[in-house]
Amino acid sequence: MSEESFDDTNKAFENEKDIILEKIVKDENNLNNCSNMINMDDVENMKKELYVLHKKDEEIENNVDCFSGDKYNVENVINLKKKKKKDEDTDSSYYKTTLDEVYDTSDISTDEMLSNYSSSEDNNNIEMNIINDFYLKDDNTYCLEWNSDIINVLSEEIKEKEKLLEDENKDICNMKSRFLKLEKYVNIKKKKIINIKKNIEEKRKIEFDEKEIFKCLQIKNDFLKKENKKIELEREKNNKKIIETQNNITTCQKNIDDIKKELILKENELNDFINKIKIIQQEEYEIEKIKLSKDKEIQNVSYNLEKYNNEKIQQDKKYEQVKMNNMKFDIELKSIIQEYYDIKKDIKNISNKYICIMDMIKCRDKTIYKFEKDYTKTIHKEKQLQNKCLHKQNLINTQKDKNIILNNQIKKIQFDINKIRKELNDKQMSYDKTIIDRDHLNKEYEYEIVEIKEKLQEEKKSLENTLQHLNETYITMSTNYEESKNEYEKEQVNNIEKNDLIKSSEQILVQLQNKLQKLLDEIKSLDLEKFQLTQTLQVIKNDYITLEADVLGTQIKIKQIKSNIKKTEKELERQKEMLYKFDFQTQVLTKKINMISGISTFEKKKENQKKIILLEKELYKNEDIYNTLNNEMKRINIEIKNIKLYQNELQEQKMNYKNLYEKLQLEIKSLESTINNEIKEKENIMLIELNLKIELDKLKSTFSKHVDNLNICKKEKKENMNNAKLSEQDINAHMESLKVIIKNINDEIHKLNIQLYEKKNKSNNLQLKLNSIIICNQKNKDQKDICPNENQHIYYKMKIDQDIINLKEQLKKINEQIDKENIETKNFQRTLDDIIQTNKEFNDNIKSIDPQYKILLKKKNKLNKKWEQINDHINNLETNINDYNKKIKEGDSQLNNIQLQCENIEQKINKIKESNLKVENNINDLFIKIERASNQLKKNLAPTTNMMKLKNKQIKDDENNLSNNNNNNNNNNNNINVNVNVNCEPVPLEKHIFKQIQMESLKEKLSLLMECFKNNIDNVIMKEVFNLIETAE
């Protein structure tokens, strides 16, 4: 029977081992599933519990070995009893102190405890009979050693143990009540933790949104980098285009220089032609002398000359047209040269603007370089922080090791239950106080929210008042604007004021760019602060996760402790049953002993002694079991104390984290409220800014249009002035040419009149009639020549008057446009002043806000303005680049037009060259023919002198006159040559043109002579001369 009981105990302990091992496996699975949510301390505690159970098994086996011996002495039994009494005394004193300090006492009695075990008495009686049968078979040698005193001692010990069991039952009931309370507390904490988890999930969502925003920022930064690269490529392309335009300009300059050189060469050629023409005139003069010597021949010649004069007038008109075309070409050359200089000026302006763009790009590159430096600094700081974190982690690990050592020491030390309970009460009081403080804080937070809303409403009202004031100011400004219009119509604003306004606007733009750079720097600082806040939030989250893991570990430990307590309760109930059975058997034995004492039979005594020995063995066994259970209870109590200490520490940590969490919640709510308010303000500001931007864009567009119109008007004005000057020059040149033509005509008429008067004396009546007819015809022709010239003068005067009237009208239009543009510039300046005033008022309103919210407002405004300014800057760069591309295209088109004009001029010059070559060839042919004719005339006239003796006198007289005239002409020619040598200065174009006209008149005269020869072939001399000319041809 003893072996079966030992097997039962071993099975019980083995079952406990299996249960604990299963729990360990489950815990390990939970660890893997929960992703390190449970600490390693729980696993270590479980291992320690296994170690304790192994020790218990070893102790039980040792005790079994002691009892399993066939023989043992009574002295050893007595010594064991004494030791047990001492242990029980110490245990009883310990339990008494604990029971006195328990708050709640249980009303459960021993009868109620035994009522549950009435059904198991029959089984116990059967077992006792089996035990008696077993022990009666043993030797009866040891039964004589027992006495009645030992039995009495055993009965007393049994009674004392019953009392101790009752006390332990009360303690167990109290412990149950306490654990129920702890379960309720743990459930409440679970609910709170669930709420905290929900809040954390909300925060995670917010953080996810922030990460998305950060990604968007990164994408925009990448986009800006790409655009910078594109701008650099466009800049290189623009540089190439500028170099090409410069090369084209140099080629144009070279072409113009070549044209000038060609013109100089042509002037020299014209001078050579003029000298040749003078020689031809001299020879012509000699020929005319020969004509005068022959009266009869001159009659026919004079008639033909009249025809020649008519043809000459027509050819003069044609020549004048050619001359006018040449003048137009000269004017076009001048206009092209002026356009070339204007293009140079535009190129200079473009180069200056390009330099400005390069400066802007350099500034931007500098800012990027600064950003890179700041980025390297931040990376260095991050490395330092990582090193610090590693150092702190090492310190934390060392502290954990120390904490483990301290925990082991604390487990060895036995804390008093009174102190623990007092601390629990104090902590409960503190927890209640914290709840009350939390309620107060929530109320204060709501009160502050209400105050903030009231302040925001007041600020809104103030802003509305400012808007009303601005509307009033706008109305007043509009009235002032109308007054200024009236004043401006009276007074003309100088162009200097416009330039000043433009300069002021440029200075404002420069200031805005500087502000933009400052705002970018501030945005960087805000980004760093945001990064630090995110890091702190991550640290807090990690701490909270560790707390949750600790709470789960404590809950698991509590469950394990509850299961252990239930097992101990079951074992205690079994022990009580055994003790009651033992008491019943002792009573039966006492009765039998009394019967034996009355009967005094020896055999019955032996039997009773055997039974007593068996009962004592069972008693020892039960006592050993009882001691082991007591030791387990003590160990469990110690573990419970340690658990309570650990729970207190966890509660303290939880309270601290709760406080931190509540503070963070308050801060987050305050930030959310401020952010919402700031978002509303931001939206209002954005609307205002959008309206202002739209107005600014409109003003800029109108301003640019007016500037373009001004430039166009200025160009038109210059062109009109140049055209007027050119028209005046054309008129003056035309007048001078007409005067010279009239003088030449009058001289020729005078000469012809002299010749006619000389011929009248010599000629007959027929000649007089012819002369009279000729004179009448000449007068009519002179009147006809004068009339068209006068009509031409009147026509040119009318044209000049019309041009002057048109120019005046254009000047009036230009002045009106200038006035409008000045008015619009004033309006633009007024709008800028209004914007500056609104900004000042807005800054004053911000200053009136509490200092606690100023920092948040600044941060918010900086973050909001950051992207707007960057986008504005990018848009401005794009617009500037597009403008420069347009201007470059315009310059290219202008250069192409200039090249086409140059090509047209070159073609015209080539045509003129060809015509000049043809004229030269014709003139050379005529000179050759005239020389041949003169030589043959001299040869033919020499033998005919004898045939004309009657006419020698007249010829001599004529020769004398001719000799005198030749001397005079020679003197004149010598003087002319001297003047030419002295005055080697270049002859003007007008004189060259008049000389060309004279040359054409000579050609016409020669053609008339040829006709005269053909008409007067009857004359012998004329026949001979004509034959000579034909042979020469």
UniProtKB/Swiss-Prot annotation:
GO biological process terms, semicolon-separated: cilium movement; cilium-dependent cell motility; inner dynein arm assembly
The keyword Oxidoreductase belongs to this UniProt entry's keyword annotation: no
Any one GO cellular component localisation term in the record: axoneme
Biotech utility: Possible candidate for an effective malaria vaccine as determined by epitope response in sera.
Domain of life: Eukaryota
The keyword Phosphoprotein appears for this protein: no
Coiled-coil zones: 212-326, 405-582, 615-771, 797-1019
Pfam families associated with the record: CCDC39
Lineage: Eukaryota, Sar, Alveolata, Apicomplexa, Aconoidasida
Protein name (record): Uncharacterized protein MAL8P1.12
Family annotation (InterPro entries): CCDC39
Protein species of origin: Plasmodium falciparum (isolate 3D7)
Alphabetized UniProt keyword annotations: Coiled coil, Merozoite
